[in-house]
Amino acid sequence: TGSLPHFFALMMGEKAHIDAQVVGYRGSGPLITDLIGGQVPVAVDTLDTLLPQHEAGKLRILATSGPRRSPFSADIPTFKEAGLDLVATGWNALFAPASMPKDRVARLGAAVEQVMREEATRRLFHDARMVAVASTPAQTAAMLKAYRAQWAPVVQKSGYQP
């Protein structure tokens, strides 16, 4: 599917020395239904998607992939704590055309950074079980560079073609 859970499952399989079979689903809903119903023995998906079913006792999250425990699930260990040296995080960012003038990028970046620091924004993100992170365009570019370096070998090894 080309998603973070897809490539994370491949990376996890390699680190754990298991042959992870990635099965594409048309969204998290059908995946969760099959996981709860026992048609799928294990799955990888985003924490915000799986947490309500975990809290309802319908499935069990074994580990999270962040560098530290999630503030939304402090009872769930990280993969690293569980003995598998894996760290991967998802993120969202605002992008603009490469041709956008630098002064506009700077203004837009400053406005977005300000909004991301507002308490109302932090509450909205928290309610969606996400953490609001304010960053500058330069910080985002650096994060993207590191992200590409982390995932390029996994994507290449998988043979994935968009």
Positions of predicted regions on the chain:
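Conserved, function-defining micro-sites of small-solute handling proteins
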Residues: 1-162
